[in-house]
Amino acid sequence: MASIPATVATVAQANMVAPFTGLKANAAFPVTKKVNDFSTLPSNGGRVQCMKVWPPLGKKKYETLSYLPDLTEVQLAKEVDYLLRNKWVPCLEFELEHGFVYRENARSPGYYDGRYWTMWKLPMFGCTDSAQVMKELQECKKEYPQAWIRIIGFDNVRQVQCISFIASKPGGF
């Protein structure tokens, strides 16, 4: 006589989960529980209604901060102070014909747009005061009043340009 194994069907319960049998969760990584209090988080919800979108048609793109109104002398000095605090070397460059983005020497898309600007004098190695940079900016504006002038900051350790912004534009731009 052959024996046939009996199978017993049980109903699976969806809410039953096997217990965790490994390491204790808090044994290696102590965790402090924090209360989720969202009342102290910053919010600009009230200001969103008054924001505007920069119109993309008919507007020339320059460098960093070019979407803003022209920077005042005080604002430019603060940007230069930031550059100097980061131990970057200030340098002035100017362009007489094309201060805006266009492609001449490179056709590939991306950050590099193929423009070459003329350096005003030499990079200001050892500069510690924004007034020195502002004096050079005034000299460059006097020599080339119809030029785009930008201030750039080089990191001479990493050998990269870290900041670049338009300091002066010709009239009508």
From Swiss-Prot:
GO terms for molecular function: ribulose-bisphosphate carboxylase activity. It holds the Pfam family RbcS. Residues 1-49 form a transit peptide. Keywords: Calvin cycle, Carbon dioxide fixation, Chloroplast, Photorespiration, Photosynthesis, Plastid, Transit peptide. The keyword Chloroplast applies. It comes from the Eukaryota. One of its GO terms (biological process) is photorespiration. It is found in: Plastid, Chloroplast. The basic functional RuBisCO is composed of a large chain homodimer in a 'head-to-tail' conformation. In form I RuBisCO this homodimer is arranged in a barrel-like tetramer with the small subunits forming a tetrameric 'cap' on each end of the 'barrel'. Heterohexadecamer of 8 large and 8 small subunits. PANTHER family: RIBULOSE BISPHOSPHATE CARBOXYLASE SMALL CHAIN 1, CHLOROPLASTIC (PTHR31262), RIBULOSE BISPHOSPHATE CARBOXYLASE SMALL SUBUNIT 1A, CHLOROPLASTIC-RELATED (PTHR31262:SF10). RuBisCO catalyzes two reactions: the carboxylation of D-ribulose 1,5-bisphosphate, the primary event in carbon dioxide fixation, as well as the oxidative fragmentation of the pentose substrate. Both reactions occur simultaneously and in competition at the same active site. Although the small subunit is not catalytic it is essential for maximal activity. This is Ribulose bisphosphate carboxylase small subunit, chloroplastic 1. It comes from Flaveria pringlei. The lineage of its organism: Eukaryota, Viridiplantae, Streptophyta, Embryophyta, Tracheophyta. The gene is RBCS1.
